[in-house]
């Protein structure tokens, strides 16, 4: 899906010193250019903001400064392989903007909404979006709140990274998706155990066709594992209103 666009020399890429992470330099060179192309300068500015303001405000730990490219930006942006042109994407529990902002940088055709409940994170996200000049909406709220769906509409894709277990992610994501929309959850090495543990709850919430896919296998030393599932055509649950109580 990505096209390599040569926007500078090898030496110019080397000037982006924070690119050098746990991956081999040649691998980073290929991955960065393949994913970000002519928007590499925007990605670098985002990395700088994460390394400074993001860490200062506690959105990331200080030990993350030397692995922002491989662990965070590339890890997030490769999910774009699974997205269609013009997809309407919601990043649930966006935090410091991961994976939503790397996706928006790599794929400006996407319509990205960052959904985050905490004010300090929302403030950071809005500052970053303004600084980078991105066409991205930041919404302060929780996925389970009814007004959130009214605000952002039905999305094609709900993405998340290190937010919650699959049962909760499914509960939060389904109401924000159009029928047939996709949930893309970046997960770790215990992904199959997690699916086995939560598959019945996921199905009861309307998730169908649960599968595990790998992104970035051609150019990342550690490809990214993603749980992909769809919102069923018939079973769709609306989020609860804030303050509503169940009646017996």
Swiss-Prot record:
Gene3D superfamilies: Vaccinia Virus protein VP39 (3.40.50.150). It is an enzyme of class 2 (transferase). CDD domains: AdoMet_MTases. Keywords: Cytoplasm, Methyltransferase, rRNA processing, S-adenosyl-L-methionine, Transferase. It is found in: Cytoplasm. InterPro entries: rRNA_ssu_MeTfrase_G, SAM-dependent_MTases_sf. GO terms for cellular component: cytosol. S-adenosyl-L-methionine binds at residues 93, 98, 143-144, 161. Pfam families: GidB. GO terms for molecular function: rRNA (guanine-N7-)-methyltransferase activity. Its main location: cytoplasm. It comes from the Bacteria. The keyword Lipoprotein does not apply. Its EC number is 2.1.1.-. NCBIfam families: rsmG_gidB. Specifically methylates the N7 position of guanine in position 518 of 16S rRNA. Belongs to the methyltransferase superfamily. RNA methyltransferase RsmG family. This is Ribosomal RNA small subunit methyltransferase G. It comes from Mycobacterium leprae (strain Br4923). The gene is rsmG.
């Amino acid at each position: 899906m990505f096209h390599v666009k040569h926007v500078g020399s090898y030496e110019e890429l080397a000037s982006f010193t924070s690119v050098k992470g746990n991956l081999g330099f040649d691998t980073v060179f290929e991955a960065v250019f393949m994913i970000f192309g002519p928007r590499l300068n925007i990605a670098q500015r985002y990395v700088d903001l994460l390394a400074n303001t993001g860490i200062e405000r506690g959105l990331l730990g200080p030990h993350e400064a030397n692995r922002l490219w491989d662990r965070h930006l590339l890890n997030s942006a490769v999910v774009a392989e699974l997205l269609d042109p013009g997809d309407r994407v919601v990043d649930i529990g966006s935090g410091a903007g991961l994976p939503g902002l790397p996706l928006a940088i790599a794929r400006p055709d996407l319509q990205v909404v960052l959904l985050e409940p905490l004010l300090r994170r929302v403030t950071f996200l809005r500052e970053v979006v303004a600084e980078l000049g991105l066409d991205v909406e930041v919404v302060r709220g929780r996925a389970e709140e009814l007004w959130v769906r009214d605000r952002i509409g039905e999305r094609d894709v709900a993405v998340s990274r290190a937010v919650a277990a699959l049962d909760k992610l499914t509960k939060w994501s389904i109401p924000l998706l159009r029928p047939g929309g996709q949930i893309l959850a970046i997960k770790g090495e215990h992904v199959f155990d997690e699916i086995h543990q939560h598959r019945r709850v996921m199905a009861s919430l309307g998730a169908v066709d649960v599968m595990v896919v790998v992104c970035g296998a051609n150019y990342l030393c550690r490809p990214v594992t993603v749980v992909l599932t769809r919102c069923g055509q018939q079973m769709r649950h609306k989020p609860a209103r804030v303050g509503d109580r169940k009646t017996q």
